[in-house]
UniProtKB/Swiss-Prot annotation:
Disulphide connectivity of cysteines: none
Reactions mediated catalytically: UDP-N-acetyl-alpha-D-muramate + NADP(+) = UDP-N-acetyl-3-O-(1-carboxyvinyl)-alpha-D-glucosamine + NADPH + H(+)
GO biological process: cell division; cell wall organization; peptidoglycan biosynthetic process; regulation of cell shape
Role played: Cell wall formation.
Family recorded in the similarity comment: Belongs to the MurB family.
Cofactor(s) demanded: FAD
GO cellular component: cytosol
Ranges for domain FAD-binding PCMH-type: 30-194
UniProtKB keywords: Cell cycle, Cell division, Cell shape, Cell wall biogenesis/degradation, Cytoplasm, FAD, Flavoprotein, NADP, Oxidoreductase, Peptidoglycan synthesis
Protein name: UDP-N-acetylenolpyruvoylglucosamine reductase
HAMAP family for the chain: MurB
Pathway: Cell wall biogenesis; peptidoglycan biosynthesis
Source species: Streptococcus pneumoniae (strain CGSP14)
């Protein structure tokens, strides 16, 4: 029996798609074909996938909702898992629990509806709750580390564990999950009671700032670089004269130099080449070496 036949038998009922390009699902609108693109509906299906991948020695990767990543044009080997369907969110007192595939922006709106404060900083961050925990997503002085109470993960051995915020050893755009091989299943956030109008005003203010400063009208991978100590990446790129700098179909945004936008059917290679070129030119101009925030995954074509 071939691996594919075995997969269809053992993983019957799970939504598995073969040779389906990731550019249809990524925020950058680039990305080649994974071997198997999977949309699990619940933790049980995710655990079945993990057991099968371990038994058959098939690589697997969870992409959340593919927002702060670039998938290379040659695609990704093994299972690629999109968790959009694991999206339940519940509220218990001042605590919100959200599954990994829940939309982060929508989760902040649920907090607003329940007059819970603390999540406002994330009201414009695209992506999933799982990805936000993985990256310790943040903006405007707030970050996931400030509000996370605990999270459930599926370990690389297929076990479910509950981790505290301390266990995750959060740092700037970093959590211990990045090295552990575990996958976020859900997260609990400890918020505080607030006033609906005040929370809404703050979310409206931050949303307006994003719309003013960020090129939301174009496909992009979000913020490309981490913030260098004592500097702002966008400012360094701008000072190096790189606004509008373009390779292939991807260019440095004129609106915010910390973003690279897909303006003309760009490819992952265009993104990668532009990122490397910007790092080199900023280093030449200011002496500062930029570090990527966006993850680049998969194989070149």
């Amino acid at each position: 029996m071939s691996v594919r036949e075995k997969m269809l038998e053992i993983l019957e009922g799970i939504d598995i798609r073969f040779k389906e390009p990731l550019h249809s699902y990524s925020y950058t609108k680039v990305g080649g074909e994974p071997d198997y693109l999977v949309f699990p509906r619940n933790r049980c299906e995710l655990a079945r996938l993990k057991r099968f991948s371990n038994q058959e020695h098939i690589p697997w990767m969870v992409l959340g909702n593919a927002s702060n990543i670039i998938v290379r044009d040659g695609g990704i080997r093994g299972f690629v898992i999109l968790c959009d369907k694991l999206n339940n969110v519940s509220v218990d007192g001042y605590t919100i629990e959200a599954e990994a595939g829940a939309n982060l922006i929508e989760t902040t709106r649920i907090a607003l509806r329940h007059s819970l404060t603390g999540f406002e900083f994330a009201c414009g961050i695209p992506g999933s709750v799982g990805g936000a925990v993985f990256m310790n997503a943040g903006a405007y002085g707030g970050e996931i580390a400030h509000i996370l109470q605990s999270c459930k993960v599926l370990t690389k051995d297929g076990e479910i564990e509950t981790l505290s915020a301390k266990d995750l050893a959060f740092g700037y755009r970093h959590s211990a999950i990045q090295e552990s091989g575990s996958v976020v299943l859900s997260a609990k956030f400890a918020l505080a009671p607030g006033t609906h109008q005040v929370i809404k005003q703050e979310m409206d203010r931050l949303t307006h700032l994003r719309e003013l400063k960020q090129p939301l009208e174009y496909p992009s991978c979000g913020s490309v670089f981490k913030r260098p100590v004592g500097h702002f990446a966008g400012q360094l790129i701008s000072e190096a004269g790189l606004k509008g700098y373009r390779i292939g179909g991807v260019e440095v945004s004129e609106k915010h130099a910390g973003f690279m936008i897909n303006v003309a059917d760009g490819t992952a290679k265009d993104y990668e080449d532009l990122i490397e070129s910007v790092i080199e030119k900023v280093k030449e101009h200011s002496g500062v070496t930029l570090e990527r925030e966006v993850r680049i995954l998969g194989e070149s074509k």
